[in-house]
Amino acid sequence: MAACTAAQQLLLVLSALGLLAAGAPQPPNIVLLLMDDMGWGDLGVNGEPSRETPNLDRMAAEGMLFPSFYSANPLCSPSRAALLTGRLPIRNGFYTTNAHARNAYTPQEIMGGIPNSEHLLPELLKKAGYTNKIVGKWHLGHRPQFHPLKHGFDEWFGSPNCHFGPYDNKAKPNIPVYRDWEMVGRFYEEFPINRKTGEANLTQLYTQEALDFIQTQHARQSPFFLYWAIDATHAPVYASRQFLGTSLRGRYGDAVREIDDSVGKILSLLQNLGISKNTFVFFTSDNGAALISAPNEGGSNGPFLCGKQTTFEGGMREPAIAWWPGHIAAGQVSHQLGSIMDLFTTSLSLAGLKPPSDRVIDGLDLLPTMLKGQMMDRPIFYYRGNTLMAVTLGQYKAHLWTWTNSWEEFTQGTDFCPGQNVSGVTTHTQEEHTELPLIFHLGRDPGERFPLSFHSDEYQDALSRTTQVVQEHQKSLVPGQPQLNVCNQAVMNWAPPGCEKLGKCLTPPESVPEKCFWAH
């Protein structure tokens, strides 16, 4: 039998989901809510004692909670690249080979970005007639060839980099904010952030962008993909005036409360427009909470060890909620091992599209889990740069390498695991365990404090199964061309498109490409 066309595949999916109506089929809208440095333990539904996330808790009560959902990397840029490609960063190029097991991302001086050879989710969704918008942080490269509107998005309001600053526009420029193809200002200038008080109106702007886009696409009767990637919970944390000082958790809690309020507005609009049953919404975060910034500017990873920058559970296990009234039964909890890469494949399935067949796709289609409660065996791989640090299979997690950061950094105050030191586990030298991995049973020991005895039958059984999975993975792995090796002061945001109209072009320094330095 001939392969199904995209249209035939869509008809089959919509028929199975009960979404066919008179006239042409309309695939479900897709809304992905990606937070920045938000921890697993920041949601009331996950046990945060202040219970300051009523809308997210309601979202979970009306949908499906995933307690075992993971990012693809303990850092922002590689995780976002994995979400939009469905592929591990080691495959899509979002890693560095400048040093062993180093986290890398896309600061202003990076020369690399998302390769044209990668197929991004919005590019593929266009084939099914979707209109695509990104709101917030892109972080997959800021040079012209990496612009999100060149990679499938139709609209953009947000920034190419994180909201670090303010800078003097001499040694380093302030980060631009874009409206579609051109900048419309810069952070700390046209888009102020008060570093002393934490006041900024950005979340309100990002929320209104989302609401306006939904209303416009509903009026057009056009299926839409909204990628809402806001960064209020990334240090320096910010919140708007009406939320500052309202949380029991300090400024970080203020930001979480505002995000929760915004999520409530988005879900309410979908319901008021009568399109909630035809809109799939998923909430998660790019990596674990940055404990180094806690408590005032960092979140909670609940019972899990360490945080952002590490491949312990606190660095990569994320809050995750799926919401789709009328399709995902209310009040469900799934212990399926999920990954941020699954959002790529699941979204394609919703649109009636198959993932690309010319490359390895790491993301799974979670619709069978969400709609029918099916469980799938799959490993979770924990990479740090070019190094496979750990793997989880079922309840067992095997550490092939352990490292938090160097003793030098640690003694100078950089601590990714404050108050959580575990002897022989949270090491400050790179320790190899590939012959005899440290293995933990995450069901009994979610904090990774008590490794199984090497001599136990349980260890030997877990080792046998884990070793097979790792060997199969590494045997077939073809790493992508590393994108995060070369830096250059001349490629920073000196003169973004549109700067001429605003009189905000800056003169770049001489181009001097050099190897990026990644400390940890």
Swiss-Prot record:
Subcellular location field: Lysosome
GO biological process: chondroitin sulfate proteoglycan catabolic process
Cofactor note text: Binds 1 Ca(2+) ion per subunit.
Pfam families: Sulfatase, Sulfatase_C
Active site per the UniProt annotation: 76, 139
Leader sequence residues: 1-23
Cofactor entry: Ca(2+)
Tissue: Widely expressed. Higher expression in liver and kidney.
Residues engaged in binding Ca(2+): 36-37, 76, 286-287
One Gene Ontology CC term in the entry: lysosome
Catalysed transformations (reactions): Hydrolysis of the 6-sulfate groups of the N-acetyl-D-galactosamine 6-sulfate units of chondroitin sulfate and of the D-galactose 6-sulfate units of keratan sulfate
Positions bearing carbohydrate: 201, 421
Sequence segments annotated as region (Catalytic domain): 24-377
CDD domains the record matches: GALNS
EC number: 3.1.6.4
The record's account of how the chain is modified after translation: The conversion to 3-oxoalanine (also known as C-formylglycine, FGly), of a serine or cysteine residue in prokaryotes and of a cysteine residue in eukaryotes, is critical for catalytic activity.
SS bond partners: 306-417, 487-516, 499-505
Similarity remark: Belongs to the sulfatase family.
Assembly: Homodimer.
UniProt cross-references to PANTHER family, sorted A to Z: ARYLSULFATASE FAMILY MEMBER (PTHR42693), N-ACETYLGALACTOSAMINE-6-SULFATASE (PTHR42693:SF47)
Protein name listed in UniProt: N-acetylgalactosamine-6-sulfatase
Gene of this entry: Galns
